[in-house]
Regions:
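Flexible coil/turn and secondary-structure edge motifs
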Residues: 2-3, 21-203
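Bacterial N-terminal signal peptides
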Residues: 9-21
């Protein structure tokens, strides 16, 4: 038993040494990327990104406005300037920001201004909130490429990321906590029907 414990202790020490060596070589701990998108109802956006390999966490919240610590009721009434949005933590070694942009575009109606499907109001506007200049350039390039596909102008904004306020807990992972209600809402809102019109059937 003691020899097993010693071997286990040695293994743990080696793992710690390896991690310390890796950090010393890079000069920083492993990086996690952050992406922020608004695409209408955050229940649906969160559900779509939860399916993407390389996404670590998704958080529903509010951003893009002026009110501090807004509530769902305040944002729903408009006047806060905030949009329902999702903040995504991802592993850049497993999924690129370009891939996240592609997922975003194919799960929204980019032609709708201040609305998405059955939901209307500036809180449902679509936007890409960039966190650095590289994200800004990639977002703009993807929007420009997409515009060539449509006659109508793309309404999606590309704006700097600002404070992100986490939504109430009952909104987090709503699709997993309340699958029947979520599917009922998504179907009746016409989200997937409109997405199929825009992008074709998903594989």
């Amino acid at each position: 038993m003691r020899s097993v414990i010693r071997r286990a202790g040695l293994g743990a020490a080696l793992l710690l040494a390896f991690a310390a060596s890796a950090m010393a070589q890079t000069g920083e701990p492993p990086k996690t990327g952050i992406a922020t998108f608004s695409g209408g109802c955050f229940w649906c956006v969160e559900a779509d990104f939860d399916k993407v390999a390389g996404v670590i966490t998704t958080t529903s919240g509010y951003t893009g406005g002026h009110a501090v610590n807004p509530t769902y009721e305040q944002v729903s009434r408009s006047g806060t300037g905030h949009a329902e949005a999702v903040e995504i933590a991802y592993d850049p070694a497993k999924v690129s920001y370009e891939k996240l942009l592609d997922v975003f575009w194919h799960n929204i109606d980019p032609l709708a201004k201040n609305a998405q499907f059955c939901d209307h109001g500036d809180q449902y506007r679509t936007a890409i909130f960039y966190h650095d200049d590289q994200q800004r350039r990639l977002a703009q390039a993807s929007k420009d490429a997409l515009q060539a596909r449509f006659e109508d102008p793309i309404a999606t904004q590309i704006v700097p990321a600002g404070p992100f306020y986490k939504a109430e807990e009952y909104h987090q992972d709503y699709h997993a906590k309340n699958p029947i209600r979520y599917k009922f809402y998504r179907f009746n809102c016409g989200r997937d029907a409109r997405l199929e019109q825009l992008w074709g059937k998903k594989d």
